[in-house]
Amino acid sequence: MESGKISVETETLSKTLIKPSSPTPQSLSRYNLSYNDQNIYQTCVSVGFFYENPDGIEISTIREQLQNSLSKTLVSYYPFAGKVVKNDYIHCNDDGIEFVEVRIRCRMNDILKYELRSYARDLVLPKRVTVGSEDTTAIVQLSHFDCGGLAVAFGISHKVADGGTIASFMKDWAASACYLSSSHHVPTPLLVSDSIFPRQDNIICEQFPTSKNCVEKTFIFPPEAIEKLKSKAVEFGIEKPTRVEVLTAFLSRCATVAGKSAAKNNNCGQSLPFPVLQAINLRPILELPQNSVGNLVSIYFSRTIKENDYLNEKEYTKLVINELRKEKQKIKNLSREKLTYVAQMEEFVKSLKEFDISNFLDIDAYLSDSWCRFPFYDVDFGWGKPIWVCLFQPYIKNCVVMMDYPFGDDYGIEAIVSFEQEKMSAFEKNEQLLQFVSN
């Protein structure tokens, strides 16, 4: 493989299936998907964790520790070791999780340079975009580097897990690895998604709408840059702006500028809607613990923003943040039926009809999803915390996912951004953006 000035060889050392250490009882062999799960695409969401050289620990010991603790953890997370059947339920047959071990012929730090991080991510994450009927529901890849550094990556069908579920699973798996020789840690995930959003019969989920022309890049905002954006928002009249709020407004405005620059046709002066959609974790709203398993997510969105509103930075920032705050408050008061992802998408499409728009793909909608505050940087298998955590979700046009990024004892934010090629070329050259990102 090649990327820029680096060429790296990889070798697959082994592939095996890891099954739960105790068989799943027959009474638990069917795990119903929730209505939310049924309407989520069968894509693979992957998270990778890079660790410095665990001094004095043999590779064989690391492999055995990970596999044994994974097997133990799957007793509690037994649906992960099963197969999705007809977009209806998971057959919890203990087929297991695929465990792949890979050798990467380079030093880890050589590919963790900023300009090569997308390449590093592609090397260590499982080579899946969708999860087919013959695939295991989840997959693990353990990668060894020449320097002794390693990466542990976990990928799972989005139909089974959201970001909160993945964070809980990784926390439990790591804790099981640390307490492998004892019974101090017994994972207790809450498998209640179907009781919150009951499954329905004959739900057909369409194929995932990837864009072949999309590219994905990461932009890192150090803590001081985020504080500047928050201070600017306060000057604009926003009370107590959050990190995610100011970055959502800032990045969506930069995206609009880039879109105008890349567009050959400027809509002849017409001001189309420019909705900003925000994903939301429903666990706090539903008063569920964070270890609740499934797709407990939905969206809310701005209703009145037009694409030409970006011309005034102050007014645009106020409009985006205030609109999203208002809509977030509304969603907290909805019934469970109205909280589902599908119900909110239907509401979104309905909101576009006043503009005579029947397909939301015809406009520049912008999706923001925050994985900040998920404790990914606390995932310690017994040899220290990760130095970098990376994420892959299949390319969605005009999408940004935010994650915490460590700066000493503080955290900035890493924004994983996906745009079509021409728009990305304009976006990454935006002078205002470059003032805030770290190299």
From Swiss-Prot:
It is an enzyme of class 2 (transferase). Keywords: Acyltransferase, Alkaloid metabolism, Coiled coil, Cytoplasm, Nucleus, Transferase. Induction: Inhibited by tabersonine, coenzyme A, K(+), Mg(2+) and Mn(2+). Induced by light with a maximum 48 hours after initiation of the light treatment. It is found in: Cytoplasm; Nucleus. Transmembrane segments: none annotated. Optimum pH is 7.5-9.0. Residues 317-344 form a coiled coil. Predominantly expressed in young leaves of mature plants. Low expression in stems and flowers and not detected in roots. Confined to the laticifer and idioblast cells of leaves, stems, and flower buds. The keyword Cytoplasm applies. The keyword Manganese does not apply. Pathway: Alkaloid biosynthesis; vindoline biosynthesis. Gene3D superfamilies: Chloramphenicol acetyltransferase-like domain. One of its GO terms (cellular component) is cytoplasm. Disulfide bonds: none annotated. The active site is at H158, D380. Monomer. Belongs to the plant acyltransferase family. This is Deacetylvindoline O-acetyltransferase. It comes from Catharanthus roseus. The lineage of its organism: Eukaryota, Viridiplantae, Streptophyta, Embryophyta, Tracheophyta. The gene is DAT.
